[in-house]
C-alpha cells in the first residue's frame, strides 16, 4: 500500500564522559516526530514502527593496574518508546527497556596492542517484549538473551 509522503523531524543527543581514569559513561536520547503528510486516509497519522522516544545509558569500569589490568566490565540499558502497530494508528506496541553487559579483556599486556577478547550479553535479564507489529496480524517478539563472544586481533 503506497504511503504517500512522510515527514520526519527530530533530534539525537549523545554525551560521553570519562568520570575517572577507570569509569566511562555514555548516554543518548532520540526524539522523532514523524507523520504522514500527503495521504488521503493517513494524513496526520504517525508511521508504524517509529517510536517517538528512544534512550540508552552505558557505563564501564576498566582496571588499569594490578592483576586485573586490561579488564573492562560494563553494563547499560536501552529504552525503546511505544510506537503504532499499523498506519491507521489503531493500536500501539508498548515501550520496552532491556539491559546489556560486557566483559572485555585488552591483550596489550601480552604484546598484542589493539587486540582484545570480549563477551557481550544482550537482553541480560531475558526480558520478553513485543518489538514490532506488522498490521494487526503479525507481531514479533524482541530478541531473547544473546551471548556473543568476539576476538579482535590487530597486527
Language-model segments: residues:
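Generic anion/oxyanion-binding catalytic loop in active/binding sites
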Residues: 1-2, 136
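Gram-negative outer-membrane beta-barrel transporters
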Residues: 2-84
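Conserved C-terminal beta-signal and adjacent last beta-strands/turns
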Residues: 48-155
